[in-house]
Amino acid sequence: MASAKEIKTKIASVKNTQKITSAMEMVAASKMRRAQERMAASRPYAENMRKVIGHVAQGTLEYKHPYLEVRDAKRVGYIVVATDRGLCGGLNVNLFKKVVSDVKKWKEQGADVEFCPIGARSVQFFKSFGGEVSAHASGLGDAPKLADLIGTVRVMLKAYNEGKLDRLYIVFNKFVNTMTQTPVIEQLLPLPKSDEEVASYPWDYIYEPDPKEVLDLLLTRYVESQVYQGVVENIASEQAARMVAMKAATDNAGEMIDDLQLVYNKARQAAITQELSEIVSGAAAV
């Protein structure tokens, strides 16, 4: 058994760790609230943009934009949004598992794959994963702006425009609630058509002054908005996961301190008993 002094040192160490995890939990809770506000503010725009694009994809257009044409999938691109930092439970691991599983299906069909990781953990993973990394972004902070992502996104759009990509997906953790964050893969290009409800009431738009000019701008902005929303959702998911992970770590530290305190008390009691025994033995010898 370890000495009482060693156990006391260990208790002090665990208490220090507990203070750190408790502070990180409170910081994550504060950041999560702000991230939720940003997510709630941008989500209606992203959802309505998706609906508009769904109608466009269903319509009969005089100008057929390349983003509306379905090509044979010979090369698939993924924009994978993960975190810059760790200590957020299995958030990144679950996301990467989903990507790897989807990549495996495409490779079985003979398609090549390339990645655009966003977030330091994503960059690190896919550089070691072995796939081609066409562009990447990290260090966006807790409140990224659309301008921070445009350059990275347009690298992938350029590849699609040049026929170097036939599919483009975005992967991120969708914020459901504080306890639940779900990794999702959403198709960006070619544009996914609307669901059955919307498709049952189709209509066409009239584009003025020029369909090509309007659609070029609209569809590019659509992709950018979906990537931005994915990043914002992932940040909210990250802070929620970190808050939960740090709370669990704080609770576990408390349990460990209680267990160590019992061991310390036993060690101290054993030491006192031994000292008393030695005193009694010494007195008897005299």
Curated annotation (Swiss-Prot):
Bilayer topology: Peripheral membrane protein
Keywords, comma-separated and alphabetical: ATP synthesis, Cell inner membrane, Cell membrane, CF(1), Hydrogen ion transport, Ion transport, Membrane, Transport
Give the chief site where it resides: membrane
Name the Gene Ontology molecular function terms of this record.
ATP binding; proton-transporting ATP synthase activity, rotational mechanism
Please name the GO terms of the biological process aspect recorded for this protein, alphabetically. proton motive force-driven plasma membrane ATP synthesis
- One GO CC annotation, please? proton-transporting ATP synthase complex
Q: Where in the cell is it found?
A: Cell inner membrane
Q: Which InterPro entries match?
A: ATP_synth_F1_ATPase_gsu, ATP_synth_F1_gsu, ATP_synth_F1_gsu_CS
Do you know which CDD domains this protein is assigned to? F1-ATPase_gamma (cd12151)
Q: Which family does it belong to?
A: Belongs to the ATPase gamma chain family.
What is its quaternary makeup?
A: F-type ATPases have 2 components, CF(1) - the catalytic core - and CF(0) - the membrane proton channel. CF(1) has five subunits: alpha(3), beta(3), gamma(1), delta(1), epsilon(1). CF(0) has three main subunits: a, b and c.
Extract the NCBIfam families matched here: ATPsyn_F1gamma (TIGR01146), PRK05621.1-1 (NF004144)
* Function noted in UniProt: Produces ATP from ADP in the presence of a proton gradient across the membrane. The gamma chain is believed to be important in regulating ATPase activity and the flow of protons through the CF(0) complex.
What protein is this chain from?
ATP synthase gamma chain
Q: Which organism is it from?
A: Shewanella frigidimarina (strain NCIMB 400)
User: What would be the name of the gene that encodes this protein?
Assistant: atpG
